[in-house]
Amino acid sequence: MEVQITNENFKTLRDGSLPLVVDFWATWCGPCRMIAPIISELANEYDGKIIVGKCDVEENEDLALEFGIRNIPTIIFFKNGDAIDKLVGAVSKAKLDEKFKAML
């Protein structure tokens, strides 16, 4: 299950006991729409093991600025409160799954 990441809930989710994957996206972004179903599938596959969130960069500009998001989609992987990896652009399910597995 995906959660909506906002300026208000990000720190709580990031600092929780489960790893966090955040997909920074926008409604007008074609590549973001391309990977959205993949992100949803992985969110379901890793439910209870990894929190998967989506952060609309237009609604949450503070977070986008904090992480220097210049291109979308950008996916940032957090573990123990720290950003440990990042992917930029539309990537394959296999590549994303590899990164998710590394989070466990």
Regions found by a protein language model. Give the residues of each.
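Proteins that catalyze or organize thiol-disulfide redox chemistry
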Residues: 1-51, 58-66, 70-74, 78-104
